[in-house]
Amino acid sequence: MRLSISSSDRRFLAKLALWTAVLAVAANLATRYAMGHWDRLDRRLEMPKFDVPANLENYALNYRQCPVVVLGSSVVGGLPPPGWEKPGVCSITLVGQGSLVGLEVMSRLTQAVPRVLFVESSFGFRDASAEEIAAVTDPVRRTIRDWFPLATASANWINMLWKAQFPVATQLWHPSESWEQWHELRKPYSDIYVQIYGNPVNDWGKHHLDDNIARFKALIAEIESRGTKVILFDSPLDPRVAELPIIALWTEKMHEAFPDHEWVSDLPQKYWLVDGMHFTSGSGEDFFQLLMSHLPEGATASAAP
């Protein structure tokens, strides 16, 4: 027996579909307008709060597929750029943070033992709060996330809405642009870092950096004791950014603290950076390949048990 839909039913379904589409568009436009005109609704500044634990949670769930790890600040988000991923190599990007919080988490994930760990040095002075660490390593929270995936940071509505509504447009370098032209035109984009890190480091700040250096040494020693090879690297920052007081002082202290470790660095003039810090796609691939050239043979073959 063939089922038939009456003309009135078809009209009803058509109206229902139309109103659904209209309401969806209206809700989207209303949300965008409200977020742009009512600061309390604009949650974009909270994105790092969810992006950092989301990336750390992702590593905690998939560490067996990560015999090689690249750990660092938002700079690592371009190592490698999308589409250039290498099997067995996982990047842990900590937006608004540095390597310290990642090392704290990895030291507590005793079952996760990468063969090689690349650690970005440049922004390691950023503190690691106990709450950020517990959000990923607390066994009760981890059990809840295992049973209820919607409880993970990556499933948070702010995270999903931000990624859907505010994609980051990649600025590409064109062969007609010299490095000097690129550098000069993008100076305004690096002004924010000059404002944040441009002040001299006072005595309290120097003492605090020493505390973080000591923590770095303890965490790296613990991770190395499990059989992981740790390689440190300096991001090829624009000289204007690299010479800022706290960044320059931290870089000096890190090299003094780890003189016997393998270091990877390169001239900044080889790379095109969007804002004096973050790679364009091609430059990210170039620096990523430089890191990969320091891998021991067979490092990506399989994860350590």
Give the positions of each predicted feature.
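Secreted/periplasmic serine-hydrolase-like ester/acetyl group-modifying domain
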Residues: 130-228
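N-terminal Lys/Arg-rich, disordered targeting/topogenic segments
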Residues: 1-13
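Alpha-helical transmembrane signal-anchor/signal-peptide segments
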Residues: 34-56
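Membrane-embedded segments
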Residues: 70, 75-150
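Hydrophobic membrane-insertion alpha-helices, especially the h-region
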Residues: 11-35
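C-terminal regions of proteins
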Residues: 251-305
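Substrate-gating cap/lid alpha-helix
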Residues: 212, 228-266
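Short extracytoplasmic
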Residues: 49-79
